[in-house]
Amino acid sequence: MEHFDVAIIGLGPAGSALARKLAGKMQVIALDKKHQCGTEGFSKPCGGLLAPDAQRSFIRDGLTLPVDVIANPQIFSVKTVDVAASLTRNYQRSYININRHAFDLWMKSLIPASVEVYHDSLCRKIWREDDKWHVIFRADGWEQHITARYLVGADGANSMVRRHLYPDHQIRKYVAIQQWFAEKHPVPFYSCIFDNSITNCYSWSISKDGYFIFGGAYPMKDGQTRFTTLKEKMSAFQFQFGKTVKSEKCTVLFPSRWQDFVCGKDNAFLIGEAAGFISASSLEGISYALDSTDILRSVLLKQPEKLNTAYWRATRKLRLKLFGKIVKSRCLTAPALRKWIMRSGVAHIPQLKD
């Protein structure tokens, strides 16, 4: 049975970045359910916008995005729609429009060969015994059993590692649904849509490489029905759909209290969305995935006496920032307050008409 210093479950932005940064310094194994290349297999449904905080992470790491990761067009504003109040406002935003699946595969491609990576793999079971973490996974057609001193859960909203560490922990979840359509709008745009009769989260749209993507986060029970209802309403705001090219869905976490941020225990650690590190006001998670990765890397390499305690303390600033997003979300999803803010015209950039 092979033994490693660190076993990473999941190679989204958080897991890939951690594997890359620990390479050559610790013996690392990493498991991921995505294929190594191509469009077959799992791909994460995502609007695919890289926020300024995530861009800063790449600046710190000295990385630049390859052209095949960047999507067309680049949009500098968000059209914010309040359906009930029939209000539309434009706010400046500095996002980079990306192809999320290509971005994830590029992040994986940066992992050095010294890391043992298993693509298209499935983690079947984890447990702790004799001060080691045991992992059973299936890859290349057969089951393997390894042990590790440290276990890292970078496995997203449905984190197996989080469920194992905190079996009684409950966090609000939504089903994120997206549909792709051929782009029909004369001017591509990015939008954020609020309709409290549909969801107490929000919906979105983005133009990307000749497609119009429409999606949102909805209650788990009847999300599809609510999604369809909102689509019908959006014709009043000049949204054009047509025939569906493809549909996607996944679970997304929605932290709503301080206790929703969990960092791990017993030499197991959670990073990115697995830890609840996702913005409640925008559902943006890549920047927090990268920030939590940097924090955990520092803790693992410095080897303080109590690693889990050190990681918990080191993420305090990040958790406070995310708690601020919870407060912001409550403001944005409060109909009266949102209506007042939008009617005030603060930060709104009106579009010139011919």
UniProtKB/Swiss-Prot annotation:
Protein name: Protein CbrA
Molecular function terms, GO-annotated: FAD binding; flavin adenine dinucleotide binding
More details: Disruption of this gene leads to greater resistance to hydroxylamine and hypersensitivity to ofloxacin, 5,7-dichloro-8-hydroxyquinaldine (a lipophilic chelator) and 18-crown-6 ether (an ionophore).
Family matches, as Pfam families: FAD_binding_3 (PF01494)
Gene3D superfamilies named among the record's database cross-references: FAD/NAD(P)-binding domain
Organism annotation: Escherichia coli (strain K12)
GO BP: any one term: bacteriocin immunity
Entry similarity comment: Belongs to the CbrA family.
Reported induction: Induced by the two-component regulatory system CreC/CreB and by the signal autoinducer AI-2.
Signal peptide region: none
InterPro entries: FAD-bd, FAD/NAD-bd_sf, Geranylgeranyl_reductase
Coiled coil spans: none
